[in-house]
Amino acid sequence: MGKFAATIAMTAALVAGLALSIDRATAIGPTATAKPGAPAPAFSAPDINGQTIGLADYAGKIVILEWTNDGCPFVGKHYDSGNMQALQQKYTAAGVVWLTIASSAPGEQGYVTPAQARADLARWRAAPTDFLLDPEGIVGRLYDARATPHMVVIDRASRVAYMGAIDDKPSTRLADVKTAHNYVVAALDATAAGQPVAVTSTRAYGCSIKYKEG
């Protein structure tokens, strides 16, 4: 093979390899369909008691989705301060459905078994409506969950009212909870009052969700 032909062949191989790596990275990352203002993608997933729970089960209700990771310090900030539990108690008492979700794959940091999830709820004294297990990452990808905590507010018409960070303080400091602007509270209160949500999307901060490859 001539020098020019060899160079062409090598270049083609490099391009092909790069294309393959890009395709693979795209395939294993979240593929979102949820968009603010658009219908919330339907889903179903098992809860920690083995029951299949679907978004359609809560038609006509305000629903909040909370992606969690029991080993993530950004999640710990909101549980160790009591912030997340207080929000769960306040809004579920008002009729809001609160679904906590774990989407990390088996063998990855953040994955929990049903028993581990129940232990987390007891340790945190958490009060969600239910805890869903998503080890295949199907629900997480639908809602572009990339980091924990990732939060989604769905209105009574089953449209996405807000998705993204819980607040505007991307830190692990417990003291920051008191001074933060909580996007989820703002979205929930506006949605409950039938008012427009001022901020409908932000970038979630926290620990990356380790999705199943493939």
Locate each region found by the language model:
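Bacterial N-terminal signal peptides that target proteins for export
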Residues: 1-11
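Bacterial N-terminal signal peptides
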Residues: 9-19
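N-proximal helix/coil linker or "cap" segments that precede and/or mark the start of modular domains
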Residues: 18-42
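Short active-site neighborhood of thiol/selenol oxidoreductases, capturing the structured segment around
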Residues: 56-76, 98, 188
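Thiol-/selenol-based redox modules, centered on thioredoxin-like
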Residues: 153-214
